[in-house]
Amino acid sequence: MSIVSMKQLLEAGVHFGHQTRRWNPKMAPYIFTERNGIYIIDLQQTVEKLEQAYEFVKKLVMDGGTILFVGTKKQAQESIKEEAERCGMFYVNQRWLGGTLTNFKTIKTRIQRLKELKRMEEDGTFEVLPKKEVIRLRKEKERLQKFLGGIENMESLPSALFIVDPKKEAIAVSEARALEIPIVAIVDTNCDPELIDYPIPGNDDAIRAVKLITSKIADAVLEGKQGEQFEAAEE
């Protein structure tokens, strides 16, 4: 039983690539045809590659691994947050802060600061501070929450990344590659699939297409978690 049907992929517009002049020749094997100046992605390969990515994610999570969902473009922001939260994983959906992976130690100090500000707000510290100071601290907290909220509970580096549009998230890709962290990604016709361990050829510009594929990766996480609980119960 396939995890996604051709009908679902077609309805979500996963097969629509970019204009033919905006393409990466390395994506040629995943292109089915060209129609009205737009490349059409071979959905049979999308199904195949999505199944491979699904199995990889499921097994990784079953072994106790974690996934960081990354998508900062408008069409991906909501799906990335919703699906990562649904499966209990981490996400970056605003801006990728350089060094999120390669300089994780520094990022962790910013996360600590966010937690400290939240504590101050909750334990009444804000109430005894001067008004101007409180306004400044609240602004700082909101900014940190915006950029780091999705990785607030990420204690160590993730086991893998799931990326929507690796061309846009080039910094995240290069950091993951430098640290040899595997990457699963939706690759459109303008991307370089060779930079990705588990490329899923598909439209990265349509909200429905992004949502469909991201939700399948989240499903893989949830299935992996069930397997992990099952194994723990057997022990």
Curated annotation (Swiss-Prot):
InterPro entries: Ribosomal_uS2, Ribosomal_uS2_bac/mit/plastid, Ribosomal_uS2_CS, Ribosomal_uS2_flav_dom_sf
Keywords carried by this UniProt record: Ribonucleoprotein, Ribosomal protein
PROSITE patterns: RIBOSOMAL_S2_1
SUPFAM superfamilies linked to this entry: Ribosomal protein S2 (SSF52313)
Keyword Ribosomal protein: yes
Highest taxon above the source species: Bacteria
GO CC entries: cytosolic small ribosomal subunit
One GO MF term: structural constituent of ribosome
Name of the protein described by the UniProt record: Small ribosomal subunit protein uS2
